[in-house]
From Swiss-Prot:
It is an enzyme of class 3 (hydrolase). Its EC number is 3.1.-.-. Belongs to the endoribonuclease YbeY family. Binds 1 zinc ion. Single strand-specific metallo-endoribonuclease involved in late-stage 70S ribosome quality control and in maturation of the 3' terminus of the 16S rRNA. Keywords: Cytoplasm, Endonuclease, Hydrolase, Metal-binding, Nuclease, Ribosome biogenesis, rRNA processing, Zinc. This is Endoribonuclease YbeY. Its cofactor is Zn(2+). GO terms for biological process: rRNA processing. One of its GO terms (cellular component) is cytoplasm. InterPro entries: MetalPrtase_cat_dom_sf_prd, YbeY, YbeY_CS.
Length: 157
């Protein structure tokens, strides 16, 4: 059974290449991957996904992480409640995403899919602070992206 998803998408900056339906599909792929990786008991996810510009991305990163620059993706994990629903917010900085895609010689859509999957997994409690956690999270991201026809993002271009 598919994990129930409530997704609120907000556009601080518009990008026609990133419509709601596409972002939703990427989040659903991440949820399905997590369900196959031990999150089978997850009843659902209530997530916010906001696309922002450099100024907002920098402000949020400074305010919540103490780092005075815009980063590619920020995730605010609120945990899974007794109802089995994971809650969180994901913020993707579109100009940083676009710059990284160019630098890494990836398509904008492939990199956007990766950052969306990455942020969704963080919202479900995955992390990459410790080496073992990082290997698990990166392996799951790679599997999820492969299901979407996207190459391993951790291989050099």
């Amino acid at each position: 059974m598919a994990t129930e998803l409530s997704l609120s998408v907000q556009y601080g900056v518009a990008d026609a290449r990133l419509p709601r339906w596409r972002l939703r599909r990427w989040v659903q792929y991440a949820l399905a991957g997590a369900a196959g990786d031990g999150h089978a008991g997850l009843a659902g996810a209530e997530l916010g996904l906001r696309l922002v510009g450099l100024a907002e991305g920098r402000r949020l990163n400074r305010e919540f992480r103490g780092r005075d620059y815009a980063t590619n993706v920020l995730t605010f994990e609120y945990g899974t409640g007794p109802d089995g629903v994971a809650r969180g917010d994901i913020v993707v900085c579109v100009p940083v995403l676009a710059r990284e895609a160019r630098e890494q010689r990836k398509t904008l859509l492939d990199h956007a899919a990766h950052l969306t999957v990455h942020g969704t997994l963080h919202a479900l409690g995955y992390d990459h602070i410790k080496a073992g956690e990082a290997r698990r999270m990166e392996a799951l991201e790679t599997v999820v992206l492969a299901r979407m026809g996207i190459a391993d993002p951790y291989l050099a271009a």
